[in-house]
Amino acid sequence: MFLTSRRGVTPGQAGFGYAVFAIAMTLGRLNGDRCVQALGGKRILLFGSLCAAAGLAVAVLVPTPAAALVGFVLVGVGCSNLVPVLYSAAGSQSAMPAGAAISAITTIGYSGILVGPALIGFVAQAATLSIAFMGVATLLLLVARSSHVAVR
């Protein structure tokens, strides 16, 4: 929708936006273990969330279809290992039983899957899809800010 409404891409070409995001997400996930071993979970959360926020900013602020596609690649790569790192951190922390921690993370994740699209749609309807995307970028910056606490 963003590519057709904001970047003038035809509906037939707009599928490339999701395709490049999904390919980047898949490649990032397949290489995630190596990246986590090399950088550590804390840095993956920090760099991943910053990469995804930057990708959304590029997609929104640079008014070309090519830039939007590059932005979606950055979002895919950046987000690809955030959830696995959070699950790992939940399973290895000692403040609560691992099963309860993983259940809490799962509940939060499913809540986001259910509420997130509706909230993005609400903001897009009230303002613009670009503003909604920048709101998501802001939330990703909060993830970056809290990465030192989320993974110890």
Located regions from the model:
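Helix-to-loop junctions at the C-terminal end of transmembrane segments
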Residues: 28-40, 124
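Short hydrophobic/small-residue motifs within alpha-helical transmembrane segments
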Residues: 22-23, 27, 110-112
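Intracellular juxtamembrane helix-capping segments at the cytosolic ends
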Residues: 80-94
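A membrane-interface helix-boundary motif in multi-pass transporters
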Residues: 121-140
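Short amphipathic helix-loop junctions that connect adjacent transmembrane helices
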Residues: 1-13
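Small-residue hotspots at the loop-to-helix junctions and early N-terminal turns
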Residues: 11-19, 99, 103
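Paired small-residue
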Residues: 55, 66-74
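Structural signature of the two symmetry-related core transmembrane helices
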Residues: 43-58
